[in-house]
């Protein structure tokens, strides 16, 4: 994606056309070195918690919910990558317990200086024909990497949900992921429930550019070591910037007075989401997802008794 690229929030569609007709000149771009590392634990694997821990904006929440609903029919999980795939990832069974460690490394932030770009490059008067129904344009890009390590296990005769959840939390806490450290992880404080009883599995979510720079992990400890390498791997991607991990979308209504358009009526100038309403929809979606998993468990149990 590029600064100035047009976006239709109703369809989650990026248009190839640029707000200002051509690439934003360097003089109109401000680059900030904002290196920062943050760590989060997602305890219950709900959409609501994932959205909150990844700081997803309300409008984007609405778009993602719509895409997830449509994907039940038209797309598979393999169509998603990185933390987008993580958000979409849901278990088939209510008996599967998941806890995730989210590592976010910010490197640089690029943003359009609107006053400068307006003076240097006039907006494209025909943009509404090239990018119909656009609602936003990309005004800022955050670079870096988001890596997510998920541990999961299923409730069985030997371990109930509470004991498994406690064991997975302790396992993640014991891993002590510290990016940049060369020390091996000390597993002496791992929970005493055996991996055989727990049958702990892992899944790693990260942009494909980083997978190509290192061997893919085969177990939890290798996944942790991979996460520890992320700062050094970021330095090898896009001249140290990493990948695009988030965008700041500027609504067209915010800069309407600057636009030189032949027919501004073809563009959507008003926000599409109410934060409270979207929050309630996310909760309902989580409840429906949980009910679907419980129903699937009942169906599987019934088939197993036939």
What residue spans do the PLM features occupy?
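Membrane-permeabilization and membrane-interfacing ectodomains
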Residues: 1-305
């Amino acid at each position: 994606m590029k600064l100035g690229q047009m976006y239709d929030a109703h369809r989650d569609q990026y248009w190839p056309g640029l707000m200002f007709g051509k690439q934003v000149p360097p003089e109109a771009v401000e680059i900030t070195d904002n290196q920062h590392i943050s760590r989060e634990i997602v305890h219950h694997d709900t959409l609501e918690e994932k959205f909150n821990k990844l700081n997803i904006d309300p409008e984007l929440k609405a778009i993602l919910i719509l895409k997830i609903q449509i994907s039940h029919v038209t797309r598979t999980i393999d169509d998603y990558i990185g933390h987008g795939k993580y958000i979409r990832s849901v278990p088939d069974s209510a008996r599967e317990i998941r806890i995730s460690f989210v590592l976010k490394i910010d490197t640089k932030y690029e943003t359009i200086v609107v006053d400068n770009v307006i003076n240097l490059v006039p907006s494209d008067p025909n943009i509404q024909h090239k990018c119909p129904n656009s609602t936003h344009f990309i005004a800022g890009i955050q670079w870096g990497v988001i890596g997510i390590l998920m541990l999961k296990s299923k409730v069985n005769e030997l371990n109930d949900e509470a004991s498994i959840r406690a064991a997975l939390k302790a396992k993640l806490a014991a891993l002590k992921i510290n990016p940049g450290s060369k020390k091996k992880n000390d597993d002496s404080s791992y929970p005493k429930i055996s991996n055989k009883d727990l049958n702990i599995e892992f899944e790693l979510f990260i942009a494909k550019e980083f997978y190509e720079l290192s061997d893919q992990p085969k177990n939890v400890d290798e996944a942790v070591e991979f996460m520890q390498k992320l700062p050094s791997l970021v330095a090898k991607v896009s001249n140290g910037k990493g990948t695009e991990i988030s965008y700041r979308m500027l609504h067209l209504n915010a800069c309407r007075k600057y636009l030189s358009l032949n027919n501004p009526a073809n563009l959507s100038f008003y926000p599409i989401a109410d934060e409270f309403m979207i929050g309630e929809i996310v909760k309902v979606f989580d409840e429906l997802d949980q009910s679907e998993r419980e129903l699937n468990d009942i169906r599987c149990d019934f088939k197993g008794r036939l």
